[in-house]
Amino acid sequence: MAKYTGPKLKQARREGTDLFLKSGVRPIDSKCKIEQVPGQHGAGARRARMSDYALQLREKQKLRRMYGVLERQFRRYYKEAARRKGSTGENLLKLLESRLDNVVYRMGFGSTRAEARQLINHKGVLVNGQGINIPSYQVRAEDVVAVREKAKRQDRIKFALELAQARAEAEWIEINAGKLEGVFKRVPERSELAPDIQENLVVELYSK
């Protein structure tokens, strides 16, 4: 599946919820009618009652788009989650949360996950002192993630940190804003993640 390059708000409208694809400077409902489906007839169209399969597919698409993962990679995450002990759905969320681009976003070094990916791709991030330019890199407990010295002067990072202060602090991450570095203390528990994600629907979809 090709990378989506169209309007990000259109994706949010398709899923009917904020996917955190924009910086959050303004509330998403001030930018678009989130409850209105995209398309020519969106203004008067109602969201049709969906079949079980359609609900499962929509939830998978929502989760995949939220974390910025392509279909093939998302399926690999699911297979890895299924191999691990415990709940497959929770394992899937933990794998996604442990991605380096997500951790950089959670630490406030990128205003969106896409911006965090760009910072990583441009070799602006260190993990335990080593340069890592792979957004999907799996961060482990006690790993130290830092912005490379030459990237610290970027205004967008300062802006992202200001935005991050308005978000709920992630208890599993310790941040030193002055040094632009943080510690991934542990993998988050399911109760600490977004309650509106129905990962069980994703498991049902892939279990068929």
Swiss-Prot record:
- Which SUPFAM superfamilies does the UniProt record give? Alpha-L RNA-binding motif
Q: Which GO terms describe its molecular function?
A: rRNA binding; structural constituent of ribosome
UniProt-listed Pfam families: Ribosomal_S4, S4
GO:BP terms for this protein?
ribosomal small subunit biogenesis; translation
GO CC terms of this entry: small ribosomal subunit
Q: Which InterPro entries match?
A: Ribosomal_uS4 (IPR022801), Ribosomal_uS4_bac-type (IPR005709), Ribosomal_uS4_CS (IPR018079), Ribosomal_uS4_N (IPR001912), S4_RNA-bd (IPR002942), S4_RNA-bd_sf (IPR036986)
- Domain of life from the UniProt record: Bacteria
What residue stretches are annotated with the S4 RNA-binding domain? 98-164
Record keywords, A-Z? Ribonucleoprotein, Ribosomal protein, RNA-binding, rRNA-binding
For this chain, the family text in UniProt reads:
Belongs to the universal ribosomal protein uS4 family.
Its biological purpose is as follows: One of the primary rRNA binding proteins, it binds directly to 16S rRNA where it nucleates assembly of the body of the 30S subunit.
HAMAP family the record matches = Ribosomal_uS4_B
What does the annotation say about its assembly with partners? Part of the 30S ribosomal subunit. Contacts protein S5. The interaction surface between S4 and S5 is involved in control of translational fidelity.
Protein name as it appears in the record:
Small ribosomal subunit protein uS4
Q: Tell me what organism the protein belongs to.
A: Nitrosococcus oceani (strain ATCC 19707 / BCRC 17464 / JCM 30415 / NCIMB 11848 / C-107)
Q: What is the lineage of its organism?
A: Bacteria, Pseudomonadati, Pseudomonadota, Gammaproteobacteria, Chromatiales
